[in-house]
């Protein structure tokens, strides 16, 4: 939906969002600040038109892509890849795919992408895994679950 609306953008300079964690040396991603910037800009509008939606989606999509590429460029400086694969819902975004192709070409690396038909939201993969567990009657009591919505990965092995 973001991609389709971004393609309708008429004023590419109307909204400018800050790239999250731009100067943060960690390889972690965070889109919460970017989502908040979008929320703030939307709250400034009296009414929301299709043009507003298109212009905001364009700015959001490009800033999100810049954020991802910024982190990946750091990863590519740490390690030489022969092949680099991207999966999940974000891999369906054509803007991101184009930027990933450029990054991989620049680094002499083969980019592996699934056909668009197989690039869906990860929720489907999680649901499928849950279905398989259910069919095998592999259950766990809810009181044995540990839920941490703010889990931190201190070290990422590359």
Q: What is each of the regions a protein language model found here?
A:
Residues 1-52, 101, 132-149:
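A short helix-loop
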Residues 84, 101-126:
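Conserved phosphate-binding/catalytic loops in two-lobed NTP-binding clefts
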Residues 81-100:
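Glycine-rich phosphate-binding loops at beta-strand->alpha-helix junctions
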Residues 68, 89, 127:
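Residue-level signal for inorganic ion chemistry
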Residues 27-28, 39-85:
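Adenine-nucleotide phosphate-binding core of ATP-dependent small-molecule kinases
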Residues 105, 121-135, 155-158:
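Claisen-condensing/thiolase-fold acyl-transfer catalytic domains that form or cleave C-C bonds
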Residues 146-158:
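Glycine/Thr-rich phosphate-binding loops that ligate phosphate moieties of nucleotide
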């Amino acid at each position: 939906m973001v991609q389709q609306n971004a393609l309708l953008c008429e004023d590419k300079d109307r909204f400018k969002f800050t790239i999250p964690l731009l100067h943060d040396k960690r390889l972690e991603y965070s889109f919460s600040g970017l989502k908040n910037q979008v929320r703030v800009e939307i709250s400034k509008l009296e009414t929301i038109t299709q043009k507003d939606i298109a212009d905001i989606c364009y700015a959001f999509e490009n800033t999100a892509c810049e954020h991802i590429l910024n982190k990946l460029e750091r990863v590519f400086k740490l390690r030489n890849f022969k092949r680099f694969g991207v999966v999940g819902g974000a891999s369906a975004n054509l803007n991101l795919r184009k930027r990933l192709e450029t990054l991989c070409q620049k680094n002499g690396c083969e980019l592996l992408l699934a056909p668009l038909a197989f690039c869906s939201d990860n929720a489907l993969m999680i649901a499928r895994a849950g279905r398989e567990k259910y069919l095998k009657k592999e259950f766990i009591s809810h009181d044995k679950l540990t839920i941490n919505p703010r889990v931190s990965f201190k070290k990422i092995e590359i």
